[in-house]
Amino acid sequence: MSTIEERVKKIVAEQLGVKEDEVTNEKSFVDDLGADSLDTVELVMALEEEFETEIPDEEAEKITTVQAAIDYVNSHKA
């Protein structure tokens, strides 16, 4: 089974239409990977589905980088 980091990066690449090797931990979804506000909402929804968790809006707003997404999932996984 893939690690959480690998799974998050795969989702980010799929949702934002970028190559997986472009998705590194320090990358910002908006500034580095070209996401817009709709992309970030869809990305959060994909993360919720993949990891079977609910991410409240106030928490979702803080998830702006690949590492932030990884950290959130790690700290909230069942």
Curated annotation (Swiss-Prot):
This is Acyl carrier protein. It is found in: Cytoplasm. Gene3D superfamilies: ACP-like (1.10.1200.10). GO terms for cellular component: cytosol; membrane. Pathway: Lipid metabolism; fatty acid biosynthesis. Belongs to the acyl carrier protein (ACP) family. It comes from Pseudomonas putida (strain GB-1). Residues 2-77 form the Carrier domain.
